[in-house]
Amino acid sequence: MSGGNRATIIAAAVMLCVLLQTSISSAATFPAGGANGWGFNMNGWPNGQTFKVGDVIEFKYMAGMHNVVKVSKAGFDACDGTGGQVFSSGDDKVTLVQGTQYFICTIGPHCSNGVKAAVTAN
């Protein structure tokens, strides 16, 4: 194999690797609650959706009316935001890591009324 052909093959292989990495690592953005947004209509969301590590959940809501608190499983089950990571801008973006992440609203009885979601990223 001549030096020119080898260089061409190596360059093509490098380009293929770059293209594969780009398509594998591209993250998707999902609106929390779908078209309804983060609020009282969370029933069934995110059922049926597939999330990957690096995907982004976008929480849109009226600041002051809701918030988003990333909590443990125990906090999720008990609707207890103590020690959780609080987001309150009304346009919050959370990048998913491996495993299940739990989100609740700690305003009034919102969490116990269904303003909560568990999202699993693989």
What are these regions (language model features)?
Residues 2-11, 17-38, 63-66, 77-122:
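Extracellular/periplasmic metallocenter environments
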Residues 40-42:
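A generic structural signal for short coil/turn motifs at secondary-structure boundaries
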Residues 66-72:
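Beta-strand acidic-aromatic groove motif in beta-rich domains, primarily in extracellular
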